[in-house]
Amino acid sequence: MAAVWQQVLAVDARYNAYRTPTFPQFRTQYIRRRSQLLRENAKAGHPPALRRQYLRLRGQLLGQRYGPLSEPGSARAYSNSIVRSSRTTLDRMEDFEDDPRALGARGHRRSVSRGSYQLQAQMNRAVYEDRPPGSVVPTSAAEASRAMAGDTSLSENYAFAGMYHVFDQHVDEAVPRVRFANDDRHRLACCSLDGSISLCQLVPAPPTVLRVLRGHTRGVSDFAWSLSNDILVSTSLDATMRIWASEDGRCIREIPDPDGAELLCCTFQPVNNNLTVVGNAKHNVHVMNISTGKKVKGGSSKLTGRVLALSFDAPGRLLWAGDDRGSVFSFLFDMATGKLTKAKRLVVHEGSPVTSISARSWVSREARDPSLLINACLNKLLLYRVVDNEGTLQLKRSFPIEQSSHPVRSIFCPLMSFRQGACVVTGSEDMCVHFFDVERAAKAAVNKLQGHSAPVLDVSFNCDESLLASSDASGMVIVWRREQK
C-alpha cells in the first residue's frame, strides 16, 4: 500500500531534524535506510489495517520521544538532506474511488491533525519554552540554526551583491512561476506562457538551461516539484495537466481537466505526492491521482470564481484556494480518502483576484502562530493569522506593494524562524522585488531589488537562501546572489 509507506516516511522526515543534532550525516543515512526498508516492506502484502495501525503507533512514539512538532517547514529548512530520500514513485497507489477498504471503516472519520489550529500557538510556545537543552528550537542560543541563517540582522542578511545570472529563453512571453528544486541550491525551473518549462542548472558556471519541456499547446500557468524532485506536475491553458520526469524531460502522462477547462494552478499534497490538487477556470478544484490519471471521488469543490492560487498547510490537512472574485476558501482534506470538505470562506476584497497563497505553521520566535501570506490586486501584501483548525483567517498586517492587475506571488523566507524577526518576499508591478519584516512595527521594508523591466510575477529562494530567483511579465528570469558576510 504505497500511500501508507509514504505517510510513514513523511512522519519520520518531519522528526528527522531532532535526531543527532550535531551529526547531520547520521540523520541523512537514517532516513535513506528508512526509505529503502519501507519501499521493500510495501511489497510484502501486509493487511492495510495493520499498516495504518503502524502509522498511528509510529506517530505516537515519535511524539512521546521528541514532543510536538514546532514547525515542519523550518525543520525541513534545517534538515534539508531528508527530502531527497523521500522518493516519489509512480507505482500504482490504491485507487480511492474503487477501494472499499478506504471507504469502509475509515470513510466516516473526519480528519484530525496532531493539534488543532486553535491550540497551535499554545503548543508552539510550550515547545519553545519547555524543550530540553540541545533540542532543535529556534532560540537566540541555537548556534547551528544561526550558522545556517547567518548571525546578522534581517537587513544585513538580505543584502544582495547583484545579479548572478539572467535567463532569457522565454523572452516576450510572461514567466508566471519560477521555483528552485527542494533541498537543492542550484537547480531551478520556470514555466512560460509560450507553452514550455525550462530546467536550469546554476553550477558549475556558466549557468545553463539543461532542457526545455515541450508538449503543452498553450501557455503553462503553473508547475510544482515533487518532494524528491524526480517529477514535475504542470498545468496549462490547454486544459491539461502533464507529469514530467525531471531526469530526462519526458512526459510520463497527460491528464485532461475533468471539466475541459483551462487549468490555472496546481500543488502537490505534501504527505502523499501521488495526489495533486488543480484549480481551473470553471471555478472548480479537483484532487487528481497522478498514478491513475483519475479524479479522486469526493475530491472536488466549487468556488465563486476562477481558481488562481492553492496552498496546503505543512501536515496536508488543510487546503486553501483563492479565486478571481476575491475569496479564499479553506478545505479539510481527508487523508484516508482524498475527500475535500469545504470549511470556511474569507472575502479578502470583493472583485480583487487572489493571485498567491503561502502557508506557514511557525513564522518566527516572535510569531509562533500558523500564518497565511496572500497577494490580491489591492496594492497590498496581506499576512493573516490562522485561528482554528478549519482555516479561519484573521488579518494580522499588510505591506504596501504595487499590484492592481498582474498575478503577483510571494513567499515566506525558508530560514526565517532561526533569526530575530521574520522576512517575506514578494514581486510587484513596480518591477522590483520587495523584502518585508513581518515583526517590525514601523518601516517594515528590509530591501528592494531593482533590475527587471516588467512587473515581477514570482520569487523563489533556494534551500539555504544564498540565491533568489525572480521572474517577470516580459519573460526574464533573474537569479540574485546574496552578499557573503
Swiss-Prot record:
Pfam families: WD40. The keyword Phosphoprotein applies. Keywords: Methylation, Nucleus, Phosphoprotein, Repeat, WD repeat. InterPro entries: WD40/YVTN_repeat-like_dom_sf (IPR015943), WD40_repeat_dom_sf (IPR036322), WD40_rpt (IPR001680), WD_repeat-ST_regulator (IPR051350). It comes from the Eukaryota. The modification Asymmetric dimethylarginine is found at R114. The modification Phosphoserine is found at S70, S74, S79. The modification Omega-N-methylarginine is found at R114. Its main location: nucleus. One of its GO terms (molecular function) is promoter-specific chromatin binding. Gene3D superfamilies: YVTN repeat-like/Quinoprotein amine dehydrogenase (2.130.10.10). One of its GO terms (cellular component) is nucleus. Disulfide bonds: none annotated. It is found in: Nucleus. WD repeats lie at residues 170-210, 215-254, 302-341, 406-446, 451-484. This is WD repeat-containing protein 13. It comes from Pongo abelii. The gene is WDR13.
